[in-house]
Amino acid sequence: MSVQKMMPIINYLGTGRRKSAVARVRLVPGNGEVIINGLPGTNYLQFNGSYLSAVRSPLETLGLEDNYDIIVKAVGGGLTGQAEAIRLGVARALCTIDTSNRHPLKKEGFLTRDSRVKERKKYGLKKARKAPQFSKR
């Protein structure tokens, strides 16, 4: 009996957050496929071109769009938040591949976490800032 040696699977990990969405991203050497929660990226992002381009944009900036497969576990939020969380996760994973990737990604703004989140509703108001109609008399 011969023992086969397994080739180590090379994973590059990155986590992205946006609004209430969290995306755990794995970059694996491949041919440019995007798999989100077990579905092809085009299906999961409902064939929306802007979401797909947002997910791929860090790879396109570095010219690596056909070199890595993107495998994502995304939870929380909506599709926009998840797509932008995936973009941040991909950019962070690319930084773990090679530190020289950091400068062009930072210049394009892919490594900046968008800290805007929904403001909470306050009591006495209808929404976060909308007050009930004021009647003088």
Swiss-Prot record:
HAMAP family: Ribosomal_uS9_B. Belongs to the universal ribosomal protein uS9 family. One of its GO terms (molecular function) is structural constituent of ribosome. Signal peptide: none annotated. SUPFAM superfamilies: Ribosomal protein S5 domain 2-like. The lineage of its organism: Eukaryota, Viridiplantae, Streptophyta, Mesostigmatophyceae, Mesostigmatales. It is found in: Plastid, Chloroplast. Keywords: Chloroplast, Plastid, Ribonucleoprotein, Ribosomal protein. The keyword Hydrolase does not apply. It comes from the Eukaryota. PANTHER family: RIBOSOMAL PROTEIN S9 (PTHR21569), SMALL RIBOSOMAL SUBUNIT PROTEIN US9M (PTHR21569:SF1). This is Small ribosomal subunit protein uS9c. The keyword Ribosomal protein applies. GO terms for cellular component: chloroplast; cytosolic small ribosomal subunit. The gene is rps9. GO terms for biological process: translation. NCBIfam families: PRK00132.1 (NF001099). It comes from Mesostigma viride (Green alga).
